[in-house]
């Protein structure tokens, strides 16, 4: 997929639910197979369905990325945690995930949190390492790696960037 439109980021709304669920399913089933068996990917894809997405939308915790009118990715953030990041396979490696993570980091920094935490799927560890995240804590699951990143901007919340 070569985007013919600029990437646009916005809060998700209830009309997005089905598309977001479909993106999650496709991303897990197609992009995680480099590190998971098909059975493991299917089990993961079937957890946390539509009700979880609806709750995140209701709390304004879910952002979407679009190329034109097409939803191509989404990120769920709660407090200082990235709870999930999914990009449509045709839009993978085109900056969608990076843009969503940067947006989440900005919002987290604005709330004064100095640290972003997440659990990365095995296939996404390299992506998060490139964005400055580091393994953190004890890995309790064979399919998830705890990671974190310190945010310098959080130290300057409320200050003018020119000071």
Language-model features and meaning:
Residues 5, 112-125, 131-163:
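C-terminal "cap" of GNAT-fold acetyltransferases
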Residues 8-22:
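A short beta-loop-alpha structural element at the N-terminal edge
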Residues 25-51:
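Conserved GNAT-fold acetyl-CoA-binding loop/helix
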Residues 59-73:
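Conserved beta-hairpin
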Residues 73-80:
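A conserved beta-strand-loop-helix scaffold within acyl/acetyltransferase catalytic domains
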Residues 82-93:
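A short, internal acetyl-CoA/4′-phosphopantetheine-binding micro-motif in the GNAT/acyltransferase core
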Residues 91, 95-103:
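Conserved acetyl-CoA pyrophosphate-binding loop and the N-cap/start of the following alpha-helix
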């Amino acid at each position: 997929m070569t985007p013919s439109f600029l990437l646009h980021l916005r809060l998700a709304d209830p009309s997005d639910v089905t598309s977001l669920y479909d993106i999650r399913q496709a991303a897990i089933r197609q992009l995680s197979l480099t590190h998971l068996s098909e059975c493991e990917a299917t089990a993961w894809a079937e957890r946390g369905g539509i009700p979880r997405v609806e709750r995140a939308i209701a709390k304004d915790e879910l952002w979407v990325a679009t190329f034109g009118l097409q939803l191509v990715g989404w990120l769920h953030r709660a407090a200082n945690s990235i709870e999930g990041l999914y990009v449509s396979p045709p839009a993978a490696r085109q900056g969608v995930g990076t843009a969503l993570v940067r947006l989440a980091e900005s919002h987290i920094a604005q709330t004064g949190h100095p640290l972003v935490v997440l659990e990365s799927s095995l296939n996404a560890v390299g992506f998060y390492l490139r964005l400055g995240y580091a393994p953190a804590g004890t890995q309790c699951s064979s399919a998830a790696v705890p990671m974190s990143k310190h945010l310098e901007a959080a130290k300057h919340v409320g200050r003018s960037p020119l000071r």
